Amino acid sequence: MRIGHGFDVHKFGGEGPLIIGGVRIPYPQGLLAHSDGDVALHTATDALLGAAALGDIGKLFPDTDSAFKGADSRALLREAWRRIAAKGYRLGNLDITLIAQVPKMALHIPQMRVNIAEDLGCHMDDVNVKATTTEQLGFTGRGEGIACEAVALLVRTS
């Protein structure tokens, strides 16, 4: 078994859309990023790549490459997962924590889990997404952006 950890932060800005966990969330701003800014999927991708010792999302999909400008983070996650599975791993579980004062995430979490499980070809019970605030402290508490952490467990299949 192998464990990986992911962390990402994006600042609010622009008109959107705001996409988290592959879900469009109604909010007046999006997240500033080279790709679509999906902080949850970026974090999940980093945790999975780390567990497989395949580097990180920036190594695989550099923000200096115009091919990834505005990229769909679900497509990036699927490509990372293809490489991980090719190394002989399956998902044990993935646990994601969104850290944001706004917007509220609870209503969107079930669909996030469905999207991620679909992209990883696993059961929804293998994917957990939760959200918390920082009680109005720091940049997330001031509503300036969103942070996210994830932990992934991979199990060798071959």
Swiss-Prot record:
Q: Does the keyword Ligase apply?
A: no
What are its E.C. numbers? 4.6.1.12
For the ligand (a divalent metal cation), the binding residues are 8, 10, 42
One molecular function GO term is: 2-C-methyl-D-erythritol 2,4-cyclodiphosphate synthase activity
Source organism, top-level taxon: Bacteria
Keyword tags: Isoprene biosynthesis, Lyase, Metal-binding
This chain's protein is named 2-C-methyl-D-erythritol 2,4-cyclodiphosphate synthase
Please tell me the species this chain comes from: Sodalis glossinidius (strain morsitans)
